[in-house]
Design a protein with these regions (language model features):
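Active-site acidic/histidine proton-transfer and metal-coordination neighborhood
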Residues: 4-12, 33-34, 72, 76-79, ...
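Acidic/histidine-rich catalytic cores of soluble enzymes
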Residues: 15-22, 150-265
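Hydrophobic faces of well-ordered beta-strands that scaffold small-molecule active sites
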Residues: 16-24, 47-49, 84-89, 123-125, ...
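Active-site beta-loop-alpha junctions enriched in small/polar residues
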Residues: 23-27, 50-54, 89-92, 128-130, ...
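Short, acidic/polar
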Residues: 28-39, 73, 102-112, 210-221, ...
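Catalytic domains of carbohydrate-active enzymes, especially glycoside hydrolases
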Residues: 33-53, 118-119
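A structural motif
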Residues: 44, 115, 120, 228, ...
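Glycine-rich, proline-tolerant flexible connector loops at the mouths of alpha/beta enzymes
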Residues: 48-74, 127-133
């Protein structure tokens, strides 16, 4: 299902746990190329590059993901000294709308091919919701939601295998794959050499379980650690209302996300320990930082 676990015996306890990266759209405004260079100047070693950011920057759609653009971006990446950890194609693979799913699969076809042209980086995807509007609702907990997602994912994995790149799912409370156990179920049901996981530990939390975050992390690593290829890092606070969409669970509170280390609510140190033992130097992309905080978030992760 995943690559063999790495042996970190020679790395030593002081080896960096992570290659720390940033989402390109969390940097100051600018073109894709300007932001890639900025990431390198700020000391990041990898980036998450969303396809929608590429489309907006170059005024293209998926048909513009061609060899010339890939060569242009590779040159800038080399100049900046960074690599693409994840090329994002976050489409709803659990939709019941057959036409919508077919259209999304064409996006995955284009994005997996482009990822191969970029050098073989992973393509990242969400785990969807079983309604055509992609709305957060209780239908995501139903067995039928898992059936729908696994069916769509299997098709996307075939495209990733054909392109020779990994396809990584990112579990989250607001989506179909919303617990460590459901992630394991997907990995068992979808038999693909391309399939792996982006693990964002905060994305699997919600107010009712936030105090048990260490147990959620333990279960995720025990059940799915062999498939984790990239980490996402953020922090959170719990606020006493459910006035807007977010990490809500009917408790009257919701999680509001911040950059890694900003609030101190989530301790990323156990993930650093795991990475040193199992995935030394794993790409770890900061989420929910801002131009004012992304360097401090980077330093927090590098200091673990």
């Amino acid at each position: 299902m995943g690559a063999p676990l790495c042996d970190n015996a020679a790395a030593g306890s002081t080896a960096p746990a992570f290659n720390v990266g940033v989402r390109l759209h969390d940097l100051p405004e600018g073109s894709v190329e300007k932001r890639i260079l900025m990431a390198g100047e700020l000391g990041f070693t990898c980036i998450q590059l969303p396809s929608k950011v590429v489309y907006k920057s170059y005024g293209i759609d998926r048909t513009g993901l061609d060899e010339d653009l890939a060569a242009r971006l590779r040159a800038v990446l080399d100049e900046a000294g960074v690599h693409v950890a994840v090329f994002g194609c976050y489409k709803n693979l659990a939709t019941p709308d057959a036409a919508q799913l077919a259209e999304s699969l064409e996006d995955y076809r284009a994005c997996t091919r482009f990822a191969a042209l970029l050098g073989g980086c992973a393509v990242g995807t969400e785990t969807g919701r079983p309604n055509a509007g992609n709305k957060v609702a209780d239908d995501r907990f139903e067995p039928a939601a898992m059936d729908a997602f696994c069916g769509g994912l299997a098709n996307a994995c075939e495209l990733a295998e054909a392109a020779g790149v990994p396809l990584l799912i990112e579990p989250g409370w607001n989506e179909v794959v919303n617990t460590p156990e459901r992630c394991r179920e997907v990995l068992d049901r979808v038999d693909s050499t391309a399939l792996g996981v982006i693990y964002d530990p905060v994305s699997l939390l919600h107010p009712t379980v936030a105090a048990q975050s260490a147990d959620v992390v333990r279960r995720m690593l025990e059940l799915n650690g062999d498939a984790i290829r990239v980490l996402h890092a953020k922090d959170y606070e719990v606020v006493d209302n459910e006035d807007s969409d977010g990490w809500c669970d009917g408790s009257g509170s919701r999680l509001v996300c911040h950059g890694a280390g900003e609030t101190g609510a989530f301790d990323f140190a156990p993930l650093a320990d795991w990475a040193r033992k199992v995935r030394p130097g794993i790409d770890c992309v900061i989420e929910n930082s801002t131009p004012a905080t992304n360097v401090a978030c980077r330093d927090y992760l590098l200091g673990l």
